[in-house]
């Protein structure tokens, strides 16, 4: 284990011997770190935080800080992070709250750029790209391979579907359907994330079905319930459209249209 002599690893912390802890970094007593993690100078990993393998935490990031929630009263809550994530300078990720399930979760393979924030009780999937100064409020669900452009933000309790793309300086206040792009200060629908689907390996046939679903929901005069019924009648039975349908049916805040 490479621990700089100025770093503080508090008693009780479980840190794999292969980890690197940089100058003036602080590792709290409830932290558990798997193999190959690196924590940069002046970074803080605290709270009941569990990290998998090979995560990189850059200078001044704070991982596992208490929730920015006035209802929080010191309850024993947690943060669970997967493997191979990168948290750049001044990124912050908060613990969960008792009222929100108690656990904030980050998947694997994500990039959380400088000054980005993941709020309490968020559930972030694999392969997230969260650009500079993005602010994700509490209780937000971000599915796999979602991209938030710089200076964008999400309201509490929103859901952002798989392979969605949120443009820079966009405010998300309603759910963003899978495969879709939203842009603008008020988070307006801007089309499909065709490039993202191609990069993720969807076939032309699969992308074609997503396009059909998109037209039924967003380019017809149907209400959402009617559109979902048509999707179930015409496009059910395929993983990409089944997920699209399930996401729409599960919306509590409404869908960005």
Curated annotation (Swiss-Prot):
Any Gene Ontology CC annotation: cytoplasm
Gene Ontology terms describing biological process: lipid A biosynthetic process
Catalysed reactions listed for this entry: a (3R)-hydroxyacyl-[ACP] + UDP-N-acetyl-alpha-D-glucosamine = a UDP-3-O-[(3R)-3-hydroxyacyl]-N-acetyl-alpha-D-glucosamine + holo-[ACP]
Subcellular compartments: Cytoplasm
Alphabetized InterPro entries for the sequence: Acetyltransf_C, Acetyltransf_C_sf, Lipid_A_LpxA, Trimer_LpxA-like_sf
Assigned EC number: 2.3.1.129
Leading EC class: transferase
Keywords: Acyltransferase, Cytoplasm, Lipid A biosynthesis, Lipid biosynthesis, Lipid metabolism, Repeat, Transferase
Molecular function via GO: acyl-[acyl-carrier-protein]-UDP-N-acetylglucosamine O-acyltransferase activity
Keyword Repeat: yes
Coiled-coil positions: none
CDD domains: LbH_UDP-GlcNAc_AT
Disulfides per UniProt: none
Entry function: Involved in the biosynthesis of lipid A, a phosphorylated glycolipid that anchors the lipopolysaccharide to the outer membrane of the cell.
Subunit annotation: Homotrimer.
NCBIfam families, per the entry: lipid_A_lpxA, PRK05289.1
Entry's family note: Belongs to the transferase hexapeptide repeat family. LpxA subfamily.
Record protein name field: Acyl-[acyl-carrier-protein]--UDP-N-acetylglucosamine O-acyltransferase
Organism: Anaeromyxobacter sp. (strain K)
Source organism phylogeny: Bacteria, Pseudomonadati, Myxococcota, Myxococcia, Myxococcales
Gene that produces this protein: lpxA
